[in-house]
């Protein structure tokens, strides 16, 4: 089947001219990432299907007003009553329960909250309606940072606060979602990393080989509260909804040492934080779109793909100016212009792109190997069958995300995993750590295949990608 997708700066139709040149992408010549079901391939824009909205909040009449901007002054009034309705709180609770999560500072687990669910939701509804709701402190814990010896902070709101945040998000997310730029892919209904990666590959194949590789420094922790609130207020005029948002922004953070009140940033661990982060960066998205820049953004990770060094430097200058005015910072050592016609490349969403090729970046591979190492220690007392069972979801899940990598990626990884297992078997047989040829003869690849070990090469073959020896 022949598919040709046309890349346009103006998005006006099936074929267009950019800088005096016809630009088209023949998907037959590339291995593209799959496109989500909600991305409109004919216009390369985002057409939101409203199945994801909370039906308990958004009536057909409200959705019609949303699509036509048919509200007074372009702002939405009287929304707080939509937040505290029991159907909305019940829908929010269902999502919180499905997402699981630990107890917050009140030590109340999801199971405990559910034991008296009707009373808990009724009490929360009354507090939100009366204006007496005050979020509790966020519990801060430190967890290992993957691929690093450092720890990173994790915020855990109480179950009650997670329900309230989800209820608020159910109300305000569609108001902003309808206007978000097409090139924003992170934390949006029906969109994901695969869509963003696919767009990057399309642009590279079309000749946009000068890349602004941008890195926002500590973005989620540095968003100015006042400026964020102003952006939310451009579409929401309900003072009580804005006050509820303020309460979450100034939510205390409690650690084992002290309690602090954040002066900037989105709430740690909050359900609403991803939406707020997109709201704050949307003006940058709109600026890049207005100036014809091919930007692809996933949360705070974004690249701008250009046709020339001059265009890329101009785009980077525009981003630097905007971030400075917005109270944000670009990492000076990690923000750069990359010329893909020369040696070198860039990383985006776990992949490394370089001169027409792509493969898992080193850090992505290292994280996977660290997880494998933890299971395949030579001192492990588990049976080989038990070890292979534990490895399967790790290897299979990693492959599913990176399966669009170059075919030469897989064989070395298979060899590495099998060698880890051979080392375990060799130790159990009290064989010295030499004579690996004998190990291969005693435990050939077919032996591990019979044991059910997941194989990257075999998975790639099933996916229609021949192995590269």
Each predicted region: which residue ranges?
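Non-catalytic, peripheral interaction segments enriched in hydrophobic/basic residues
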Residues: 387-429
């Amino acid at each position: 089947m022949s598919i040709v997708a046309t890349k346009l700066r103006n998005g006006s139709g099936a074929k267009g001219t950019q800088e005096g040149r016809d630009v088209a992408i023949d998907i037959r010549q590339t291995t593209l990432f799959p496109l989500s079901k909600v991305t409109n391939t004919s216009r390369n824009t985002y057409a939101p299907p409203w199945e994801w909205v909370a039906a308990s909040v958004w009536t057909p009449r409200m959705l019609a007003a949303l699509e036509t901007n048919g509200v007074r002054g372009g702002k939405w009034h009287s929304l707080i009553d939509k937040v505290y309705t029991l159907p909305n709180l019940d829908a929010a609770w269902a999502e919180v329960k499905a997402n699981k999560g630990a107890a917050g500072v009140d030590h109340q687990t999801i199971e405990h909250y559910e034991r008296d669910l009707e009373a808990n939701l009724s009490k929360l509804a009354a507090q939100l309606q009366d204006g007496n709701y005050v979020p509790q402190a966020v519990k801060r814990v430190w967890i290992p940072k993957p691929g690093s010896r450092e720890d990173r902070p994790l915020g855990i709101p109480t179950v009650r606060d997670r329900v309230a945040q989800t209820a608020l998000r159910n109300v305000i997310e569609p108001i902003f979602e309808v206007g978000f730029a097409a090139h924003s892919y992170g934390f949006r209904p029906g969109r994901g990393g695969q869509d963003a990666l696919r767009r990057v590959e399309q642009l590279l194949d079309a000749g946009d080989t000068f890349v602004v590789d941008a890195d926002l420094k500590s973005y989620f922790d540095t968003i100015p509260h006042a400026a964020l609130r102003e952006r939310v207020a451009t579409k929401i005029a309900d003072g009580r909804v804005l006050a509820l948002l303020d309460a979450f922004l100034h939510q205390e953070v409690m650690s084992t040492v002290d309690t602090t009140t954040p002066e900037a940033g989105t709430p740690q661990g909050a359900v609403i934080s991803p939406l707020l982060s997109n709201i704050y960066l949307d003006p940058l998205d709109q600026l890049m779109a207005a100036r014809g820049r091919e930007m692809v953004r996933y949360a705070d990770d974004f690249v701008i793909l250009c046709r020339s060094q001059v265009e890329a430097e101009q785009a980077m200058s525009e981003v630097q100016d905007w971030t400075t005015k917005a109270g944000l910072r670009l990492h000076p050592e990690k923000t750069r212009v990359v010329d893909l016609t020369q040696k070198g490349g860039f990383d985006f969403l776990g992949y490394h792109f370089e001169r027409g090729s792509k493969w898992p970046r080193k850090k992505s591979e290292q994280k996977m190997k660290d997880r494998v190492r933890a299971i395949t220690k030579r001192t492990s007392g588990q049976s080989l069958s038990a070890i292979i069972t534990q490895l399967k979801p790790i290897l299979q899940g990693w492959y599913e995300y990176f399966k669009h990598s170059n075919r030469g990626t897989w064989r070395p990884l298979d060899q590495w995993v099998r060698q880890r297992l051979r080392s375990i078997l060799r130790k159990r047989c009290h064989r010295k750590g030499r004579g690996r040829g004998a190990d291969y003869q005693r435990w050939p690849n077919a032996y591990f295949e019979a044991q059910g070990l997941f194989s990257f090469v075999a998975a790639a073959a099933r996916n229609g990608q021949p192995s590269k020896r």
